[in-house]
């Protein structure tokens, strides 16, 4: 799994725009992409999407147990510490798949959703990675095709995120993306600051902490998470890079691995992003997946592209279900087995095919893997001392709330 990542991390992070590494796909780069894809997948596995739960829209797990409870630790040798959870809200109406709301009158929060996490490599992880890796992993959306068919995101000025941009070439971004990234809710303890501010402040804190080391910032996400990864990376390079010391600028590398990303903005936005010479973006797209083509009009692609085609996989059923082509685990299966553009499918990485069926029923039946096998234990039902069962939210979530409240109180001045 590790390969030569520790010695090739600059090249694998896009220092040469992945020249000669994509076709055919370099083995270490294949491992590298899968590593960050797995970190994006953690966001899906931890997210509470059950509207009957009063904790819907939040992470089921605390920062300390996030990787262990989602299966990341046993499957990956790289070790990280989660330092920050990201929360977001929206000032405009968004589809249910973006901001999920609870049916419970005792909901933890009516307007906020957990959007992902920030993690930093431990000393053990640093040895395998070759440097101190900071990761921003944005959670994707649930059932994204619902909005693709009937929701329109008009373009609007993004100068609030990119002040000082050329007024004659003003970048424009879909208003839904901007709203989720920049909105605040003073009534919420989670969204008093926007997702934008939460991410940028934590990145600045971590860079100060590790300013004397080789550091990378890698942003990753699938679907909506891919959009947020690109937007937040461009934000950081545009606004914070000039404030970084020259020595840190020399060693710092900022990379995005975006899986199945919808389009984000117009050609002016593309020109702004491409002017950020220290930003490296690799978009992974699946040939039969339609989502990377949405929204359709006046939008354009950004970054380098690695194209896969899961239709070539002999492990997968022939299906007309468009969701099968957009699923993140299907993408990672495709990365593990893609050959050069005209080649067939062959697993070059020993990646468990059972992972495909975590949220799908896409594997051929002969592999004897049940469909949709990843579920929260007992679907979140907890047995009381008297033997009765009820959906009372994850106990670890209550623990997290207590820790957050304690931390908030400790930060108050007397």
Swiss-Prot record:
Residues 386-414 are annotated as: Disordered. It comes from the Eukaryota. PROSITE patterns: LIPASE_SER. Keywords: Coiled coil, Cytoplasm, Hydrolase, Isopeptide bond, Lipid degradation, Lipid metabolism, Ubl conjugation. GO terms for biological process: lipid catabolic process. GO terms for molecular function: phospholipase A1 activity. Acylhydrolase that catalyzes the hydrolysis of phospholipids at the sn-1 position. This is Phospholipase A1-IIbeta. It comes from Arabidopsis thaliana.
